[in-house]
Design a protein with these regions (language model features):
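Positively charged, low-complexity intrinsically disordered leader regions
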Residues: 1-59, 63, 131
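Active-site cofactor/substrate anionic-group-binding motifs, chiefly glycine-
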Residues: 45-98
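Glycine-rich phosphate/diphosphate-binding loop of Rossmann-like nucleotide-binding domains
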Residues: 51-63, 145-226
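A short, gly/pro- and small-residue-rich
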Residues: 111-128, 236-258, 284-285
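Rossmann-like adenosine-cofactor binding region
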Residues: 198-279
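Adenosine-phosphate binding glycine-rich loop
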Residues: 261-262, 268-309
Length: 309
């Protein structure tokens, strides 16, 4: 694996496939035995440097470390006040002397890059404004479990072309998934990320489609994915965003354009009645809690692989 995991584009196809394979094996062992036979992370610590609050990311990382014999040390914004009380390079240099791996959930991608630049231990992007690459790994594992294979699968994303959308584009393209994105004109994914995904897709024979039409995006999809319309830090834009995104709600009418057995996916937290109807997210096609569960296992596989274990 690369030294750090900062972007979903950091992995080659064989690396991404091996990670998913390993995550699936860890999941099977954990579900079958309720424990792992080997504890390769004994005596090892993961530092969780979080500027943003978290449920899934924090618990999945901490539980994953514990299940493999290690432990997690959680540092909230108020604990270190990174960039104000202490510079980002100094935080990285200090933590490198104590811990074996670092996961950062921050506001700006540049912060993750700076941590990686000055860290002597692997750094994992646990979410930033640009990407959510651990989530994308969990999503691909979920899709693979349900569909049997990823190559040629059709994944539709509708709503805000945000960090989650970016990582899905990049990792989907890497793994041969055809990704179609339906977003309002002013909320489309970053053109640089789209161009990068298109280059990757050229090698994997996947297709990338960007449209303003939610119906066109979900046409024939194996899975339909959405996220909140206003992410953390965008709450002040809520009032202006709601009417723009209303036509992009994932509800039974929109799902009818997808395949009959299409999955519904969401990274959570969700706002029922906004980006998705309660009927869909709480219905039989929803795999949102499988995605959440899979965060645990892909992150375990990622930590082990980054540490060469």
């Amino acid at each position: 694996l690369p030294r750090h995991y900062l972007s979903a584009a950091d992995l080659t196809r064989p690396q991404a496939e091996a990670l998913l394979e390993r995550a699936a094996a860890l999941k099977a062992e954990w579900r079958g035995q309720g424990r792992h036979a080997d504890l390769p992370l004994q005596g090892k610590t993961l530092a969780l440097v979080f500027e943003k609050p978290s449920l899934r990311t924090r618990v999945a990382f901490e539980a994953g470390m514990t299940q493999l014999g290690g432990n997690g040390s959680y540092l909230a914004a108020r604990d270190i006040d990174m960039g104000t009380r202490e510079s980002v390079p100094d935080v990285a240099r200090n933590l490198s002397r104590w811990v074996q791996v670092l996961a950062a959930r921050v506001f700006r991608h540049s912060t993750v890059e700076e941590l990686a630049k000055y860290s002597d231990v692997p750094v994992i992007n646990a979410l930033c404004d640009r990407e959510h690459p651990c989530q994308a790994l969990a999503d691909m594992l979920t899709l693979r479990e349900r569909r049997g294979r990823l190559d040629g699968a059709r994944l539709a994303y509708v709503g805000d072309g945000n960090n989650v959308c970016h990582s899905l584009l990049l990792l989907g393209a890497t793994l041969g998934v055809n990704v179609s994105v339906g977003c309002p004109l002013d909320y489309q994914p970053d053109p640089e990320i789209v161009a990068q995904a298109e280059r990757i897709a050229g090698d994997s024979d996947a297709t990338i489609t960007i449209t303003q039409s939610p119906q066109e995006a979900v046409d024939g999809a194996d899975a339909v994915y959405t996220d909140v319309w206003a992410s953390m830090g965008q709450e002040h834009e809520r009032a202006q965003r709601m009417p723009v995104f209303a036509p992009y709600q994932v509800n039974p009418a929109l799902l009818r354009h997808a395949r009959e057995e299409a999955l519904f996916m969401h990274c959570l937290p969700a706002h029922r009645g906004e980006e998705v109807s309660a009927e869909v997210i709480d219905g039989p096609q929803s795999v949102v809690f499988d995605q959440a569960e899979n965060r645990l296992h892909v992150q375990k596989a990622l930590i082990l692989s980054l540490l060469g274990l």
